[in-house]
């Protein structure tokens, strides 16, 4: 699958913009419910002079879970170590990470749903009792050794909370769901980032980018970088609505944040299957994509915005999607 500019998953260049990320809760735009509760939990932990309880962050990709983990460490005044579920392959990998933590540190595990069950079982006593049980030797000579760990906060992030085992999920004292961002919130993020870039976007330009950002800050900042490219080549030192919309049109990102892949998927439903219902595997074969990719990457936004419906018999194109594509009912 080619890398899409509208993909909520991280691109290599997204990691290069670490300096643009907010460092405190006050700087963090959006997610007011989660942010408000998290602020209370952090303040209470600091008053008690305790480590913050373990935190599970879940929601679609690109909404700021990694940023929030860093902010938690900053607000608590502690260090942070970052890893990902797929990177922890053996018990020794996890033991090495846990043993390197300083008192109060944050351990951030992205894609925590991808931890193996054997790794999870080692994590349970670490989360509950701040200790590590490891087996030394083999066969009759094997013995269990308990290693004490300093108090720490595990922050887990996942796009699939339902894939976490119940024992692991239950060990998180704080669970926060991150929602898609509103247009005003995304416009505020675009405005902030554009100032950091030194290419300030005016209000209408920020809103034009925000409308096409699929409710996701990561996409908003990526689109802004591309619009900035057009501004620099045009020898402009600021971004106005005309330049922004022109650049986004050239990138084939329409006014509601759909790109060519989205249009191809929706049009195939309309033109080849009379709007459905049609099964996921059939759609995948028609547009030449993997069914899992469609379900995980393309569908969430189309469903959330009301372009598609899921029914027991398959996917159905909505009247809203027909109007957006300029199709008459029955086409």
Curated annotation (Swiss-Prot):
Binding site for ATP: 20-21, 62, 65-67, 128-130, 171, 181, 218
Region (Head domain (RuvB-H)): 255-331
GO molecular function: ATP binding; ATP hydrolysis activity; four-way junction DNA binding; four-way junction helicase activity
Region of interest (Large ATPase domain (RuvB-L)), residue spans: 1-181
Top-level enzyme category: hydrolase
Binding site for DNA: 310, 315
EC number: 3.6.4.-
One BP term from GO: DNA repair
Ion transport recorded as keyword: no
Keyword terms: ATP-binding, Cytoplasm, DNA damage, DNA recombination, DNA repair, DNA-binding, Hydrolase, Nucleotide-binding
Primary residence: cytoplasm
Catalytic activities: ATP + H2O = ADP + phosphate + H(+)
Protein localization: Cytoplasm
GO cellular component, one term: Holliday junction resolvase complex
Chain spans, region Small ATPAse domain (RuvB-S): 182-252
Binding site for Mg(2+): 66
Job of this protein: The RuvA-RuvB-RuvC complex processes Holliday junction (HJ) DNA during genetic recombination and DNA repair, while the RuvA-RuvB complex plays an important role in the rescue of blocked DNA replication forks via replication fork reversal (RFR). RuvA specifically binds to HJ cruciform DNA, conferring on it an open structure. The RuvB hexamer acts as an ATP-dependent pump, pulling dsDNA into and through the RuvAB complex. RuvB forms 2 homohexamers on either side of HJ DNA bound by 1 or 2 RuvA tetramers; 4 subunits per hexamer contact DNA at a time.
Free-text note on domains in this protein's UniProt record: Has 3 domains, the large (RuvB-L) and small ATPase (RuvB-S) domains and the C-terminal head (RuvB-H) domain. The head domain binds DNA, while the ATPase domains jointly bind ATP, ADP or are empty depending on the state of the subunit in the translocation cycle. During a single DNA translocation step the structure of each domain remains the same, but their relative positions change.
Record family assignment: Belongs to the RuvB family.
Subunit structure: Homohexamer. Forms an RuvA(8)-RuvB(12)-Holliday junction (HJ) complex. HJ DNA is sandwiched between 2 RuvA tetramers; dsDNA enters through RuvA and exits via RuvB. An RuvB hexamer assembles on each DNA strand where it exits the tetramer. Each RuvB hexamer is contacted by two RuvA subunits (via domain III) on 2 adjacent RuvB subunits; this complex drives branch migration. In the full resolvosome a probable DNA-RuvA(4)-RuvB(12)-RuvC(2) complex forms which resolves the HJ.
Annotated protein name in UniProt: Holliday junction branch migration complex subunit RuvB
Source organism per UniProt: Exiguobacterium sibiricum (strain DSM 17290 / CCUG 55495 / CIP 109462 / JCM 13490 / 255-15)
Lineage: Bacteria, Bacillati, Bacillota, Bacilli, Bacillales
